[in-house]
């Protein structure tokens, strides 16, 4: 059970910190066979030029190989332990299969060490089990949904995320996302029962700019604070409002301007997300 801890204001950097204590998480090192080297780019491309702003620095990390396909059918597994993963907001669970293999999965809510987990065509509807959408009852809450059969989970993977099976339409299953969007997904795609754990992630407060730097996030400079050569909002005598509707440094409208342009998949969206 997660414990919300508010820090005492012993210093300016501790005054606003709200942390989440997780006594159930593994305190040792991760399973080394499932680790990969992860090198930082600092937002630069192969030419050394910044292609993604506000990236750089941060603590060194290893990537954990997560089983997003859940395709090891018919082999029973047990949750060996829950772990912290620096690469995502969700926690991860280390599974130990009956044949000795170990895999990481996203840790579902209410799943703890020692719980049995399985995947297959007709497994029971229990948190942590993975099966095709066509075999999941209407109204069931799921996470880690595939968008193409066998590609691996792409939807509802962050902390506290979930979707709901809303109905069936021929070869498709209707899925309601948290945004309110109703979407058609092929019934052969897999999903995991339950919602992603670590819902308390949204309650954390870093408390200081330095904590953001530990995560590899650099400062964001406002356009109105720049010179005209650097941003369309830049320049002017004294403080100004920018003089125009909000745009990016490249003059593209932002702050609410719709950018979706994918006609090919528009037919899969039954209802748009809530405004």
Swiss-Prot record:
Q: Which GO cellular component terms are attached?
A: large ribosomal subunit
The entry's keywords:
Ribonucleoprotein, Ribosomal protein, RNA-binding, rRNA-binding
Work out whether the entry's keyword set contains Protein biosynthesis: no
**Does the UniProt entry include the keyword Nucleotidyltransferase?**
no
Q: Set out the biological process GO terms recorded for this chain's protein.
A: cytoplasmic translation
For the region Disordered, give the residue spans: 31-59, 224-275
Gene Ontology molecular-function annotations: rRNA binding; structural constituent of ribosome; transferase activity
Q: Which PROSITE patterns match?
A: RIBOSOMAL_L2
**What is its biological role?**
One of the primary rRNA binding proteins. Required for association of the 30S and 50S subunits to form the 70S ribosome, for tRNA binding and peptide bond formation. It has been suggested to have peptidyltransferase activity; this is somewhat controversial. Makes several contacts with the 16S rRNA in the 70S ribosome.
Q: What family does this chain come from, according to its entry?
A: Belongs to the universal ribosomal protein uL2 family.
Summarize the subunit comment: Part of the 50S ribosomal subunit. Forms a bridge to the 30S subunit in the 70S ribosome.
Protein's name in the database: Large ribosomal subunit protein uL2
| Lineage of the species this protein comes from | Bacteria, Pseudomonadati, Pseudomonadota, Gammaproteobacteria, Thiotrichales
Task: Give the gene name.
Answer: rplB
